[in-house]
């Protein structure tokens, strides 16, 4: 989770490194939500989050920043991020429903249904 270790951008900046950081933003603590949905379908608590403006964070560190909202945008955004001389954040916005690359909230609920 980027919000648990985003301060390492300052260390990278100080060390002269140029990291490319990919943030998958589904507006939730997805791993916790996945366990809640599997064990207690539709009874979730404390997993929806309001994220900060990651582009503003990128700018604050002098990094390149891009927000991607569709698959077709990713390749070009990633290429630009890799070309950045100062590091970059690429925020990939996904739906909360897409809880992981392999499943959805609906699928978890359906599998847990009696």
How should these model regions be labeled?
Residues 1-114:
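Thiamine diphosphate
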């Amino acid at each position: 989770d980027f919000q648990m270790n985003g301060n390492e951008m300052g260390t990278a900046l100080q060390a002269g490194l140029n990291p490319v950081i990919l943030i998958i933003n589904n507006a939730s603590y997805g791993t916790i939500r996945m366990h809640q949905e599997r064990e207690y379908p539709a009874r979730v608590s404390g997993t929806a989050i309001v994220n900060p403006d990651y582009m503003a964070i990128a700018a604050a560190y002098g990094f390149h920043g891009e927000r991607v909202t569709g698959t077709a945008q990713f390749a070009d955004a990633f290429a630009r991020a890799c070309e950045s001389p100062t590091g970059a954040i690429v925020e990939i916005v996904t739906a909360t429903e897409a809880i992981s690359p392999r499943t959805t909230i609906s699928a978890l609920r359906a599998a847990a249904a009696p």
